[in-house]
């Protein structure tokens, strides 16, 4: 029996939580926010270069950082995925959506940690909304990265590679070591 998208996302989230703790220990959310901002920038760059390979890689990396952020925040990515939505009426316009999202991620992460302008809970809710929008965007872009592609199919392919990396044993090149087997 095939697993649903939500079941598979939950499974990857559990696996990623264990992998992240093993490789990096307990991390802070702002580090994942920085990683997510970096990867969204790579999505925009891949789009502008019209590079399907780079788009595929960056979408998968966005997913990995989102999983890690969700694990730290205590959120379930499948729930956010099922409630994914555009941020505004122009949500599918690329690459223009990236800069406002990156700014909003930085804003809500910073203000939430400072507990100002609405407090930590307000900014956490805003971040959840941003994640739902990012998931909407990544799902839409996945079909551009690979014919018939979905966010889940790209995340699974990326996770298959990333999960083999041991950053404790190979802190300078775990990606290369894992790829060369």
Q: What function would you assign to each model-found segment?
A:
Residues 1-181:
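Flexible "arm" and connector segments at domain edges
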């Amino acid at each position: 029996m095939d697993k649903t998208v939500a079941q598979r996302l939950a499974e990857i989230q559990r696996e990623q939580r264990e992998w992240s703790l093993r490789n990096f220990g307990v991390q802070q959310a702002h580090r994942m926010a920085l990683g997510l901002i970096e990867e969204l920038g790579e999505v925009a760059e891949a789009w502008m270069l019209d590079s399907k390979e780079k788009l595929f890689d960056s979408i998968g990396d966005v997913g990995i950082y989102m999983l890690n952020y969700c694990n730290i925040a205590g959120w379930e990515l499948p729930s956010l995925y099922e409630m994914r939505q555009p941020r505004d009426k122009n949500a599918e316009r690329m690459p223009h959506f990236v800069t406002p999202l990156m700014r909003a991620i930085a804003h809500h992460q910073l203000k939430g940690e400072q507990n100002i302008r609405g407090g930590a809970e307000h900014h956490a809710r805003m971040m959840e909304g941003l994640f739902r929008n990012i998931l909407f965007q990544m799902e839409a872009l996945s079909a551009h990265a690979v014919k018939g592609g979905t966010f889940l199919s790209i995340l699974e392919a990326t996770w298959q590679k990333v999960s083999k990396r041991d950053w404790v044993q190979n802190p300078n090149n775990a990606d290369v070591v894992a790829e060369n087997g």
